[in-house]
Amino acid sequence: MSYSFTEKKRIRKSFAKRENVLEVPFLLATQIDSYAKFLQLENAFDKRTDDGLQAAFNSIFPIVSHNGYARLEFVHYTLGEPLFDIPECQLRGITYAAPLRARIRLVILDKEASKPTVKEVRENEVYMGEIPLMTPSGSFVINGTERVIVSQLHRSPGVFFEHDKGKTHSSGKLLFSARIIPYRGSWLDFEFDPKDLLYFRIDRRRKMPVTILLKALGYNNEQILDIFYDKETFYLSSNGVQTDLVAGRLKGETAKVDILDKEGNVLVAKGKRITAKNIRDITNAGLTRLDVEPESLLGKALAADLIDSETGEVLASANDEITEELLAKFDINGVKEITTLYINELDQGAYISNTLRTDETAGRQAARVAIYRMMRPGEPPTEEAVEQLFNRLFFSEDSYDLSRVGRMKFNTRTYEQKLSEAQQNSWYGRLLNETFAGAADKGGYVLSVEDIVASIATLVELRNGHGEVDDIDHLGNRRVRSVGELTENQFRSGLARVERAVKERLNQAESENLMPHDLINAKPVSAAIKEFFGSSQLSQFMDQTNPLSEVTHKRRVSALGPGGLTRERAGFEVRDVHPTHYGRVCPIETPEGPNIGLINSLSVYARTNDYGFLETPYRRVIDGKVTEEIDYLSAIEEGRYVIAQANADLDSDGNLIGDLVTCREKGETIMATPDRVQYMDVATGQVVSVAASLIPFLEHDDANRALMGANMQRQAVPCLRPEKPMVGTGIERSVAVDSATAIVARRGGVVEYVDANRVVIRVHDDEATAGEVGVDIYNLVKFTRSNQSTNINQRPAVKAGDVLQRGDLVADGASTDLGELALGQNMTIAFMPWNGYNYEDSILISEKVAADDRYTSIHIEELNVVARDTKLGAEDITRDIPNLSERMQNRLDESGIVYIGAEVEAGDVLVGKVTPKGETQLTPEEKLLRAIFGEKASDVKDTSLRMPTGMSGTVIDVQVFTREGIQRDKRAQSIIDSELKRYRLDLNDQLRIFDNDAFDRIERMIVGQKANGGPMKLAKGSEITTEYLAGLPSRHDWFDIRLTDEDLAKQLELIKVSLQQKREEADELYEIKKKKLTQGDELQPGVQKMVKVFIAIKRRLQAGDKMAGRHGNKGVVSRILPVEDMPYMADGRPVDIVLNPLGVPSRMNIGQILEVHLGWAAKGIGERIDRMLKEQRKAGELREFLNRLYNGSGKKEDLDSLTDEEIIELASNLRKGASFASPVFDGAKESEIREMLNLAYPSEDPEVEKLGFNDSKTQITLYDGRSGEAFDRKVTVGVMHYLKLHHLVDEKMHARSTGPYSLVTQQPLGGKAQFGGQRFGEMEVWALEAYGAAYTLQEMLTVKSDDVNGRTKMYENIVKGEHKIDAGMPESFNVLVKEIRSLGLDIDLERY
């Protein structure tokens, strides 16, 4: 096994028992692939598939004019280059987007020609607005902020059958219904009512009998009955009534008469129930007809019109009920044979027949008019309008789209379903197999008559007791709409608006000689796109607290949003975990609160298929042997197979062991024999999402706490010095790399140069393309503000000279340590109560932790100020501010902007700004002063940007934006100059590195080669030496050497051209950058100048901050205790954190205890390694110890492949503690933890004996830091990875003396953002009442709240030194009086 450059630095010891069959896939693939499919930039114009933008254009174009003589055709589209790159867009507050241009062809037909003849074709490119581009990490930059488009889980188009579970009617009767849901267009519902009549609705409007719809589709009564019923024929004669014998129909019936065979023997006596044996006897007897009683005909319905063959008179119509009068009429007219509908109570109901009787419409036209009146009440139904509406509802491609998915779902549910033998022989089987044979193949993306009839038939068959209803929460009935599809829908809706406008103008296209770009206005398209990305419910401000929160946000799947559910209407079933979620959607990670179950996270291995359904991978099992073959199955496909769990036992050849294996089949857990198993899970962590799979020992935690643990990891604030978790799960590296926080090498090579801002790698010759100068430059992100104001900062993780392979770590980012996710710090933890400071989950923490900056985090705040053009004149950014103290002015430069590096506190001026004041009436004294001293500075008011309350920090960056045409101030100019200077240095460095690399390659290539001549009179045929090359005046003279080897000569020429291109490219880039910086900035209307000040705030850990482990064990820091008072071990080491042991049993998150034990072992092993290194032991001893660590149990590591230097580097990286991986559901067992504890703390070690371990090495003796005495009982001590969460007390603490008031009630506002007061509510009033504190209460309810006059009076009294209160009438009382008056009740106050 070979390790990469990064892996061998710190190998994580894994306890996994099963080898990894499938690598963790790229975690952002869903987003990136979806948008790539939408744009199709990689495909040539003619190779683009009908997806995304292409599909949207194809669905709207061609646009044909109303008269039909002009049409616009779509040829292809192109996307330009974005004007600004991503960081520039973020800085300027603009959208990272590219211009979209479509080539459109205008075709004008000849009006005079007898047949369609093209008269003229005009073609040009039309600008269609800007399309936001996705960043490489799967987000979008919209108006300067990073946003994520969350995927939506919605109901798949198709047909669904369900019942109301007996909730609608008091009797508890099941009412069946069906619904055809298109991707776009009207919904069609069919439903039974409690009387078993069948109705339909369009778009949830008024219900109408379903037979109206069938008549509107062109069926008459007789045809309707013919479709939905089997027939019975009765033969009438003077001897009685006979019917054709259909054996299958007799089962379970009671014989109305004696059934006799041909000899007259009784086969079934009258009144007896007919059994299966009786039916066999009847069939064997060869009977073809049965006698029936004439009375049994009564109540049956006729299947067809009965017409007298002689007179042509209609004796009875189809669906008429047979009565005695009708039978008598038949007798008189000599009717010998009648056909009725075969109806029984058990499995052939009279639903359609009864519905037809309630339907009064006569024929197709009347039925369509009835539908028109229901859809457009009050509008007169003209024949044309009626036809148009009916056809547009379900049969027009413009207004109805079932989509590819919808058609597939529809066909599988209706035409392609498996029928039982009884169904095959019934009307339903005939309908699907004969009448509608081939309907599934010709079905387009609109509904056909057959589709509607097949849906009704399936619903009737369900009511008859055949078939199953659908489960709408099954993931086979819910599909994912990702970014690409959501954007495509918005784009299409914008294009549809364009189409309406274009149609109006197309008629004038020829007469006015218009071109395509004159006809098309792209505003509606760009408005639709802008609205979607800017304010859609699914376009969300990206959660960027740490790399995990970024990844999880992009993998989120929401059931909310347009076309989805709403929180209020979503019931329990939709939110619940469903068996089909297995391996597709995480059962653990979902928010607490109103969104629980509606917002989910994709499982680690889940992906979407072409139809949008979620799939999960499985290993194929053949004859009990597990193969390496992997298939992705959707929820529908999975239902057909028997699937074993990932932890099923296998022998060395991969065969399933044991008589029975735990499996899943159709959502149920079963025990199956190995030969029945068809698939097996790929990994134990397949079920859960990324965040949940980061929790070690997840299998030992209660699900509710695991949910909290998964959610709280996303809120962890990046620490100043990230520290990898000692106990991880092995997926940390994937998260760090895929989130793009840590930088990995694009190509292998040698590290040429490293500083804090840049890493330069010279690419290996075999990975560089021919003639290309192979240098990769990685510019690192330094101290940048994230969306949540946390700090994004990348640190190089390599040294000059390191040899890297593709995918190796180049630089660490926020919350990553050696390319692994590191959200918190490893803390030594003791579980014990300590003076009540850990009551109710509080956390007692050592002062040493705060002093060592273990949990110190940097937060970057961005403060903006804009200078606008006001009616009274322009605002000015200046240093000249009235009444500003000298101390504050010293921080500002001559332009009035704070210096970088200045330490600022609340209230300090950051940017000086003055606003013109309106002309005020001057007093005579002021006039006199004006006359004496001339114009003064009093006609401006100070509107400077000041540091907000409760905030202090260091200014780390200032950006100044100036509108085009306005003089830049010195500060703005100096920022531009320094930026250009830095950029030029960057380019020069790059060119230098390119040059050096190129000439190194040339030297390796030509030294030792023969030359035909060259500079400094190089003789023909002489060999080129290093000395000769060194002696040339310039390295560029090397290109003048004429080589004998033509291939090498060509390569030399290529490198020369390549270098020249690089130089030209660098000059071009510099000019572009210069132009970007020196041209005016696009600012909002009326804004002349904008200044952004970035302030870095250091937040140390303090009491009130929220902290948590990874198991949902959260708490608030109650006290930071001096290190000398903390409980300490026998060797004098104090613990870092003291937690309450009572927080574990009731919460049932035992995983934290196992983590603590394994962490304790990791720390002990680290200490032993540290001791060995300090004692300078031989590499062989280290290798032997590491072998015991890595190859004792679990996954084996190949340490023999490492050199002694690599072993020493690995050991020194483990000094602080070994790295363990305990994968989810395949983690370390108790015995393995004991094994590690014994390795860390061997009993023969005297140091170990001193600590006072218990037998299992999990508890030690601790001493009280205050008294020095040992605690009575041994205490569980260990190491846990503990996180500091984003809920910091600094951001929540807030105090107010006076501040803003509400206009109506005159009471203080509430909340920190409004600088509000504390509400003294009803319960607090009771408390004061209980104590009888009358004066305090009076103050609270009047002067301190909303008694304006009393407040003013009290202030005056205090100023005068009179400490008394004159309380008046609270304003809220006046509001109450007004409220009562508004209800028409007069109320007056009588003052005494």
UniProtKB/Swiss-Prot annotation:
Give UniProt keywords alphabetically: DNA-directed RNA polymerase, Nucleotidyltransferase, Transcription, Transferase
SUPFAM superfamilies attached here?
A: beta and beta-prime subunits of DNA dependent RNA-polymerase
Q: Which InterPro entries match?
A: DNA-dir_RNA_pol_bsu_ext_1_sf, DNA-dir_RNA_pol_bsu_external_1, DNA-dir_RNA_pol_su2, DNA-dir_RNAP_su2_dom, DNA-dir_RNAP_su2_hyb_sf, RNA_pol_bsu_bac, RNA_pol_bsu_CS, RNA_pol_bsu_protrusion
Q: What is its EC number?
A: 2.7.7.6
What Pfam families does this protein map onto? Answer: RNA_pol_Rpb2_1 (PF04563), RNA_pol_Rpb2_2 (PF04561), RNA_pol_Rpb2_3 (PF04565), RNA_pol_Rpb2_45 (PF10385), RNA_pol_Rpb2_6 (PF00562), RNA_pol_Rpb2_7 (PF04560)
Gene Ontology molecular function:
DNA binding; DNA-directed RNA polymerase activity; ribonucleoside binding
Query: Which intervals of the chain form a coiled coil?
Result: none
What superkingdom heads the lineage? Answer: Bacteria
Gene Ontology cellular component terms for the protein in this record: DNA-directed RNA polymerase complex
Q: Which reaction does it catalyse?
A: RNA(n) + a ribonucleoside 5'-triphosphate = RNA(n+1) + diphosphate
Give the UniProt record's GO annotations in the biological process aspect.
Answer: DNA-templated transcription
PROSITE patterns, per database record: RNA_POL_BETA
Quaternary structure, from the entry: The RNAP catalytic core consists of 2 alpha, 1 beta, 1 beta' and 1 omega subunit. When a sigma factor is associated with the core the holoenzyme is formed, which can initiate transcription.
Q: What does this protein do?
A: DNA-dependent RNA polymerase catalyzes the transcription of DNA into RNA using the four ribonucleoside triphosphates as substrates.
Under HAMAP family, the record lists: RNApol_bact_RpoB (MF_01321)
Q: Which family does it belong to?
A: Belongs to the RNA polymerase beta chain family.
**What protein name applies here?**
DNA-directed RNA polymerase subunit beta
Organism classification, top ranks?
Answer: Bacteria, Pseudomonadati, Pseudomonadota, Betaproteobacteria, Neisseriales
